[in-house]
Amino acid sequence: VVIIVIAVIAMYNSLVQARIKVDNAWSQIDVQLQRRFDLIPNFVETVKGYMTHESETFEKIAELRTSWANTESVAEKASLDNELSNALKTIMAVSEGYPDLKANQNFSELSEELRNTENKISFSRQFYNDTVTMYNTKLEVFPSNIIAGIFNFKSRDLFEAESADALSLIHI
């Protein structure tokens, strides 16, 4: 009986530790995504003067920033991240036609910061998905699946991103 109690406690603690790792990995993504959202207003202001025909894209970015602040779930944040990446791709593609903009030092610095942030997001997303996969596996394998069911541990969603990141076009 004592051995069974010790085994249950050990499995429970293992599941709690795995859940904490998932939460930590998510907060790392959240920090990087927030950093990107913080960079975007300066970036938009820099390009606005050059790109007068992209007002819809700028409005979309503003809407996404507002939605981001009110979103909690991983799936919703992943969807917003994909939309933002697409908007950034549009801006970066259009910027190719503006040599004066590309020569602007502020634009170059912000593009570099965005590229670095995109790299960090990519690495954080990979780490999060690896951590979630390990956690979800623990929830499925015997005998920890019994403990997970008793103590109501829930599986977590992966952070699904589109195949091409905004990073692919941020190469000024």
Predicted regions and their residues:
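A helix-centric hydrophobic-segment signal that preferentially recognizes long
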Residues: 1-170
